[in-house]
From Swiss-Prot:
Catalytic activity line of the entry: 2 superoxide + 2 H(+) = H2O2 + O2
EC nos: 1.15.1.1
Entry binding sites for Cu cation: H45, H47, H62, H119
Keywords, ordered alphabetically: Antioxidant, Copper, Cytoplasm, Metal-binding, Oxidoreductase, Zinc
Chief subcellular location: cytoplasm
Enzyme class: oxidoreductase
Listed name of the protein: Superoxide dismutase [Cu-Zn]
Temperature dependence: Active between 10 and 60 degrees Celsius.
């Protein structure tokens, strides 16, 4: 079993901890919570780079080793890092629970050392017809991020 964690933070008061667990070659289970968000949907993605030297802006694009278009988590044609939306309640808290087979914690496409990013707006899952739909899901600014690191 491989475990990883990302501690999310931002200058906007959004924070959280996201845990990743993978058994063998099975799917990765993502759990955790995020606080300080405005109520509603927020794009939730794994980005390609674990670089936060310029805040969340330096985490690069969505993790996309297969060179596909942006999509929903259940779509065949999607970035590996497309995890859909996280829903914040009226209290601004998100409880994350995702199981996904495209974000392994080991092997050539491992997400260890990359970043998880929470966006300001809903991810349209590539179906919004906006010029950014097929690249970012038109999910808006990056309100919090954290580098995914191995956990003991």
């Amino acid at each position: 079993m491989v475990k990883a964690v990302a501690v999310l933070g931002s200058s906007e008061g959004v924070k959280g901890t996201i845990y990743f667990v993978q058994e063998g070659d099975g799917p990765t289970t993502v759990t955790g919570s995020i606080t300080g968000l405005k109520p509603g949907l927020h794009g939730f993605h794994v980005h390609a780079l674990g670089d936060t030297t310029n805040g969340c802006m330096s985490t690069g694009p969505h993790f996309n080793p297969a060179g596909k278009e942006h999509g929903a988590p259940e779509d065949e044609n999607r970035h590996a890092g497309d995890l859909g939306n996280a829903t914040a309640g009226e209290d601004g808290i998100v409880t994350v629970s995702v199981v996904d087979s495209q974000i392994p914690l080991s092997g050539p496409n491992s997400i260890i050392g990359r970043a998880v990013v929470v966006h300001a707006d809903p991810d349209d899952l590539g179906k919004g017809g906006h010029e950014l739909s097929k690249t970012t899901g038109n999910a808006g600014g990056r309100v919090a991020c954290g580098i995914i690191g191995l956990q003991g």
